[in-house]
Amino acid sequence: MKVYKFGGASVKDAAGVRNLLDIVTGEQELFIIVSAMGKTTNALEAVFTAMQQGDEATALQRIDESYAYHRTIIDELMGADRTIEDIDKLFEQLRNIVRNTIYRSSDAELWYDTIVAYGELISTTIISNYLNGHGVANRWIDMRRAFLTEQRHKDANVNLEATEIRLKREIADSNVSVFVGQGFIGGAPDGTTTTLGREGSDYSAAIVANVLGAESMSVWKDVDGILNADPKIFPDARKIERLNYMDTIEMAYSGAQIIHPKTIKPLQQKNIPLYVRPFGNKHASGSVITGDVERAYEPIMIQKSNQVLLKLHSRDLSFVLEEKFAKVFNTLESHRIKTNIVHNSAVNLYMSVDSSWHIDDAILELEAEGFDVEKSEDVEMVTIRYYNDELYQRYAAFDERIIIKQVTPHSLRFVRHK
């Protein structure tokens, strides 16, 4: 079994879906994971926002706009007279959620997951139908039934043992060897829909690869492979042919967009190679991530923009006590806020954290626990792994925008004003 994952940018239009068909034609023993098409997740987030605000008319309008977008793709692929009943049913389900739900803020994340999951349900239904009509017999899999997650919304973890049983049951006794399933989504023990975190389709594919013992996983992207930097920011960026699991985890943790941070562990557990391959050229080698690659590449430079800087001041001047640190980290963890860099003095603590819905709630709690908190949102984090003196001098030695700097033998990391 191989696992292929296709992102939303790759299947944003009919041409992309045709290219997917070209890539998978002739493959056997293949599990295909697909994201929502194009910017559909953003569109469905707009539906959710309108629902939060009690604006039913706008929510329904956004659904109709999404339907028109997907209908255009279907028309180009299959003809204007082709009806896919399951697509119409999915959109009608969305409309009924908006019309019939009594929204409560305490259920915000539940309804967020329920609504945005339709992006993947719709994309995979279109693609499964198209493949079946063009010589690639396949079975559509509802990953809400196949993936058992914890009872947590927006960033759920997957129960591997239970998921292995469920997924194998879903594909058992099939007369086909190709399967199409959704990335990003799963199901909680109570049957509600969960999501695995933004851009979580990579993680979904890695879970499938793990529980099915796949020989490899391939992520098809609109890049030549893994680059050592974002070429939009660092013009001298070059492709890395081979990378090990550990450095990939470091890159993902630091904000590299190439792979979702949770993706590597399920692959590493079973030593499954991960290929990052160019969607526009199926014959190109791309990059490969395995467990047996020695470091033999250039410095890796990553810029992460969705950062918030928190400056905490202890009112009783006792910040050095471990109890104070514990309070801060426990509060942030309870709100699922990821901390990236921490720097402390005797009574002040500086923290760079990922932007989150819950930051203001966490700040209120921290203030109640005896801290004065200042928040800055105009910051970014830069990481240079395997830096050298020339890079240190160029980026970190004299930049007055830098607020926090961390230097280790292998990594240079700093937070600066944009």
List the model feature ranges, each with a label.
Residues 1-256, 264, 387, 417:
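Nucleotide/pyrophosphate-binding catalytic subdomain
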Residues 8-9, 37-38, 185-186, 201, ...:
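Short, glycine-/Ser/Thr-/acidic-enriched flexible segments
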Residues 171-188, 251-275, 311-325, 375-396:
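Electropositive, surface-exposed helix/loop patches at the edges of structured domains
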Residues 242-290, 295-297, 305-307:
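A conserved active-site cap/scaffold subdomain adjacent to cofactor or substrate pockets
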Residues 285-418:
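A conserved regulatory-domain signal marking ACT and ACT-like small-molecule sensing domains
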